[in-house]
Structures are given as C-alpha cells and as structure tokens.
A protein has these predicted regions:
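Beta-lactam-recognizing serine transpeptidase/beta-lactamase-like catalytic domain environment
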Residues: 1-128
Length: 128
C-alpha cells in the first residue's frame, strides 16, 4: 500500500504546521479588514460537526480543501518561507518613503515574524 502521509501525520499536526507558516492568523498588513482564515483541528470539527470526525477531513485539509480557508497573502507568505529556508516575514507594502527629488525620508526594514521554521518532512531514501 502506498504511503499516506496526511493520515500518518494527522490533522492536528497539519494544523500545527499551518500555524507555523502563518495560517489561521491575520498577517498584520494593516489594510482593509482581513480574515485569519481557518486551518481546522480535531477540536474544531468536534465543535462544528457535533463531535463527528471522519478520516476524510484530514485528507481534505492536507490538500487545502474542505473546512480549510486561507488568504492569497497567507499562501504567498508561506511559499516565500519555503523558498527562503524557513523565515516567515511580516508583509509590507512600502520599502521607503522618498521626497520628489528622491531623498529617502524613511526606510522600512523587513521584519521577521518567525525564524527558521525548519524542516518538517522526513528524509526519504532513494534506495529500493
């Protein structure tokens, strides 16, 4: 039988890593109302589905479907963290404020929300 990583890891572990990558929380960008999204846990399903938990919920969550909701910005930030080695940055729109002649009035440095999310996938052997 092929490996079933989502079921082996479980829904709560998937939710934990979702939180590490900035899901289920507002990004703090500060423009317009913002949704934190939702990365469901077993307790969330117990509350919202009258205590009934089915294994398929884990599979749906693993592929971002079912009760999982995320914003486009959350998704972009998580991809950036994957690409840069595990640092989740606070999103910002402005890098610097300049006068009409190009003089810098104020600069905004990148701010780290979480550093070194780390490796969470087990190493796979290529030998058969």
């Amino acid at each position: 039988m092929p490996p079933r990583p989502a079921q082996e890891v479980g829904l709560d572990a998937l939710a934990y890593w979702g939180l590490e990558f900035g899901f289920n929380q507002k990004t703090g960008l500060g423009v317009n109302p913002e949704s934190p999204g939702r990365i469901p846990t077993r307790s969330w399903f117990a509350t919202h589905y009258r205590g009934q938990f089915r294994g398929g919920y884990t599979l749906n969550a693993a592929i971002g479907q079912g009760a999982t909701t995320v914003t486009v910005l959350q998704l972009a930030l998580s991809y950036a963290a994957l690409a840069n080695g595990g640092t989740l940055y606070q999103p910002q729109i402005v890098r610097a404020v300049e006068t009409a002649d190009g003089s810098v009035v104020q600069e905004f440095s990148p701010r780290v929300r979480r550093r070194s999310i780390g490796t969470f996938l087990p190493a796979r052997s290529n030998s058969a």
